[in-house]
């Protein structure tokens, strides 16, 4: 964006009274630009208000600033991402539970070895543990 040079309309000089059409044109452009900026800021403030409603505030009584809102949103998104990635590691909770049981058996000196995945799956189905989702 190139720098704006002050015009005669800005200076309030005698030329304003000599060329009212230029002055009115500049005023209309300035009013239109101000209206666009006001509308942009209202949209931005509305977006921040909506973000504040979905981001946990953890006991804050005062309204969060824009900066604080962005920081809280970032922390919240990262926490949700961690939860999802941790949940992704435990796709099959029955097998995870079974692996924990086998680990316990191995530490006690009982080692079970299966030659095929079918035998392992049969063993898995014989356990009565059922995962209950939240």
From Swiss-Prot:
Keywords in alphabetical order: Cell projection, Developmental protein, Differentiation, DNA-binding, Neurogenesis, Nucleus, Transcription, Transcription regulation
InterPro entries documented for this protein: ATOH7_bHLH, bHLH_dom, bHLH_transcription_factors, HLH_DNA-bd_sf
SMART domains xref list: HLH
Principal location: nucleus
Region (Disordered) residue spans: 1-27
GO biological process: axon development; camera-type eye development; cell fate commitment; eye development; neural retina development; neuron fate commitment; pigmentation; positive regulation of neurogenesis
A Pfam cross-reference name: HLH
Family matches, as Gene3D superfamilies: Helix-loop-helix DNA-binding domain
Biased composition range(s): Basic and acidic residues: 15-27
Alphabetical list of PROSITE patterns matching this protein: BHLH
Source domain of life: Eukaryota
UniProt xrefs under SUPFAM superfamilies: HLH, helix-loop-helix DNA-binding domain (SSF47459)
Keyword Transcription: yes
GO cellular component: axon; nucleus; perikaryon
Entry GO MF terms: DNA-binding transcription factor activity, RNA polymerase II-specific; E-box binding; protein dimerization activity; transcription cis-regulatory region binding
The bHLH domain, residue ranges: 28-80
Compartment annotation: Nucleus; Perikaryon; Cell projection, Axon
The protein's role, per its UniProt record: Transcription factor that binds to DNA at the consensus sequence 5'-CAG[GC]TG-3'. Involved in the differentiation of retinal ganglion cells, photoreceptor population and optic nerve development. Required for retinal circadian rhythm photoentrainment.
Protein name: Transcription factor atoh7
């Amino acid at each position: 964006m190139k720098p704006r040079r002050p015009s005669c309309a800005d200076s309030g000089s005698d030329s304003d009274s000599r060329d009212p059409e230029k002055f009115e044109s500049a005023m209309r452009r300035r009013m239109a630009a101000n209206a666009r900026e006001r509308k942009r800021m209202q949209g931005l403030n509305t977006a921040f208000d909506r973000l504040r409603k979905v981001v946990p505030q953890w006991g804050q009584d005062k309204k969060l600033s824009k900066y604080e809102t962005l920081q809280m949103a970032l922390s919240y998104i990262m926490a949700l991402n961690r939860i999802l990635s941790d949940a992704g590691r435990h796709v099959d909770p029955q097998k995870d539970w079974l692996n924990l049981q086998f680990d316990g058996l191995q530490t006690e000196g009982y080692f079970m070895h299966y030659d095929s995945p079918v035998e392992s799956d049969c063993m898995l189905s014989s356990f009565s543990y059922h995962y209950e989702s939240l």
